């Protein structure tokens, strides 16, 4: 915590100057009173912010979708509809609007709110994280939506969907993605019943749904939910399924889905499936027809995007929580041991380098302006290009 006035366990989003890492401002939120059922202790913020047109959008630990002015209060202005921030110093965040998903749509987050926002046009999309209660049996809020769309300027609710209903296996921690498939702008999100669904981006009309579990998987512990973010590539949707990392390792599945189909496309939309993979919470990276897909057991799989043929598998020897980055002919991937491996892109396995950051790497590297930014559990690094 950079502000000595803020003490104790909190969820905090910090802003730093890109050029030299100087701390600028932070958005600090107290933990929810309900405790670990909604807001697991000492886990901070699990949402990655989206930056667009001078605004940072993210989901706080309190289940709020928040829009923040990137300038904070350093510009001498209190922007937006929220004017009652408790502190308005230059190191405080300037809140433009907030949408409380617990209050407004009745969401009941399980353990953490974990969605990273995505935008399309005037709308912003997030998962509500609605899930089971502490019993891991009951759904306290079965009518709450799984996905919502808000006006990104005002925070007004535009549409919602609850196709999951009361079939949530555990929690809902995936993030939506947006893509144009067959000429139709779609919002796509994996959900807590193990199904992935696609919606018309503007209206929220459900276009299709696909079950990522074998039909003989009928009991909750034999079905995987979806935590990763889907990727759209050449009119196909790619995603791997998994479970809460606390459940450990297990059998997973990865799919290529033809999302030009409609309604239940579990059979008609399946292009290929890849079963030699363990449970995964990672989003694939796709480059020049090759998929780089990690699993939670520590393996990185290189797969042909058209056929599902596997070219190689690299063992990192540690659990993988984050997702790979492909840039300049290289694949970057961190693991729970704090190692970051760099591999050459292509159908032949070649490890270029490996370094250790001193503590676990749970996030995904981000490139910008000739540098690579990545964080370990307790540090943020900016690495210069060679």
Residues of each region from the PLM?
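Noncatalytic, solvent-exposed loop/strand surfaces
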Residues: 1-386
């Amino acid at each position: 915590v950079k502000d000595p006035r803020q003490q104790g366990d909190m969820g905090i989003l910090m802003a730093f100057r890109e050029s030299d890492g100087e701390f600028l401002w932070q958005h600090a939120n107290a933990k929810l009173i309900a405790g670990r059922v909604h807001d697991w202790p000492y886990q901070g913020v699990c949402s990655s912010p989206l930056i667009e047109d001078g605004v940072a959008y993210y989901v706080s630990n309190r289940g709020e979708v928040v829009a923040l002015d990137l300038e904070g209060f350093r510009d001498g202005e209190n922007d937006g509809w929220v004017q009652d921030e408790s502190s308005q110093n230059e190191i405080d965040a300037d809140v433009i609007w907030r949408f409380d998903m617990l209050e407004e749509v009745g969401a009941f987050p399980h353990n953490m709110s974990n969605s990273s926002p995505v935008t399309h046009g005037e709308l912003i999309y997030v998962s509500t994280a609605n899930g089971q209660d502490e019993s891991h049996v009951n759904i306290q809020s079965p009518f709450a939506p799984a996905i919502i769309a808000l006006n990104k300027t005002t925070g007004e609710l535009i549409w919602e969907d609850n196709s999951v209903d009361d079939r949530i296996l555990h929690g809902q921690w995936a993030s939506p993605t947006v893509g144009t498939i067959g000429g139709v702008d779609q919002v796509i999100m994996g959900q807590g019943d193990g199904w992935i669904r696609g919606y018309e981006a503007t209206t929220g009309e459900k276009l299709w749904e696909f079950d990522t579990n074998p039909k003989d998987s009928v009991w909750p512990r034999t079905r995987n939910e979806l935590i990763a973010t889907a990727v759209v590539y050449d009119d196909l949707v790619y995603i791997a399924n998994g479970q809460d990392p606390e459940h450990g390792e297990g059998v997973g599945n990865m799919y290529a889905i033809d999302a030009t189909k409609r309604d239940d496309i579990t059979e008609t939309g399946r292009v290929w499936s890849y079963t030699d993979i363990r449970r995964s919470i990672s989003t694939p990276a796709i480059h020049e027809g090759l998929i780089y897909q990690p699993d939670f057991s520590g393996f990185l799989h290189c797969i042909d995007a058209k056929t599902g043929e596997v070219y190689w598998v690299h063992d990192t020897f540690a659990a993988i929580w984050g997702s790979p980055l492909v840039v300049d002919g290289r694949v970057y991937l961190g693991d729970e041991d704090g190692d970051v491996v760099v591999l050459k892109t292509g159908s032949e396995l070649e490890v270029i380098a490996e370094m250790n950051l001193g503590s676990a790497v749970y996030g995904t590297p981000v490139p910008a302006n000739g540098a690579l930014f990545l964080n370990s559990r307790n540090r943020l690094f900016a690495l210069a290009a060679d």
